[in-house]
Curated annotation (Swiss-Prot):
It comes from Bradyrhizobium sp. (strain BTAi1 / ATCC BAA-1182). Keywords: Cytoplasm, Lipopolysaccharide biosynthesis, Nucleotidyltransferase, Transferase. It is an enzyme of class 2 (transferase). The keyword Cell inner membrane does not apply. This is 3-deoxy-manno-octulosonate cytidylyltransferase. The gene is kdsB. The keyword DNA repair does not apply. One of its GO terms (cellular component) is cytosol. Its main location: cytoplasm. One of its GO terms (biological process) is CMP-keto-3-deoxy-D-manno-octulosonic acid biosynthetic process. Its EC number is 2.7.7.38. It catalyses: 3-deoxy-alpha-D-manno-oct-2-ulosonate + CTP = CMP-3-deoxy-beta-D-manno-octulosonate + diphosphate. Belongs to the KdsB family. Gene3D superfamilies: Spore Coat Polysaccharide Biosynthesis Protein SpsA, Chain A. InterPro entries: Cytidylyl_trans (IPR003329), KdsB (IPR004528), Nucleotide-diphossugar_trans (IPR029044).
Amino acid sequence: MTQPKILVLIPARMASTRLPGKPLLDIAGLPMIVQVLRRAQEANIGRVAVATDTKEIADAVIAHGGEAVMTRPDHPSGSDRIYEASCKLDPAGEAEIVVNLQGDFPTILPQNIRDVLLPLSDPAVDIATLAAQIHTAEEDAAPSVVKAVGSPIGERRLRALYFTRATAPHGDGPRYHHIGLYAYRRAALERFVSLPPSPLELQEKLEQLRALEAGMRIDIGIVDTVPRGVDTPPDLETARRLLSKA
């Protein structure tokens, strides 16, 4: 069977209040966005590019041998940005799968980027994402930790039913920390960005709920660990420490 063509896109912009200029902050000798680019390249699943509205970010990526595409500054979400980027980079629509990798995941494992493709082996799945089991009460209670609620459909696989910032589901049993890494079928991404924001999306401030409310199927692959995002100065120091040892 022919392997599908895959386009990995990393949306990046400067609008961080807690870490100004976040994509260009140095981590182990490279701008953070270039560290994320390296992890995507190491996954070796397809073409990789950074989608940005900021010339300084594009220049940094290109200076380190990467590919960047400029997008409009007024996109409401990363998904809209990667859709515009996919249309510019692949106007013929040859890429069947588009991966959305957050630009603040410099320590993500390349294997996790490969893992997010696995649920799409089922043709009924529109969008694939990842989650890891929650092991601490602090993580369980934190609204900043998005919980993935799903029905088990196989070993280390869930069919997504809901995503929430609340502690859910109630009662005994595992709960899962959602990881913001997505693999879209090209047609699913096009449909997703054409939809208006949905009521639950606006209430929870979670754009993936737009897809669920529209009847799209999201499957979740279970992985062992959550990649460390960089949102605060302590996060930045942790990433620097981890990658300085790599």
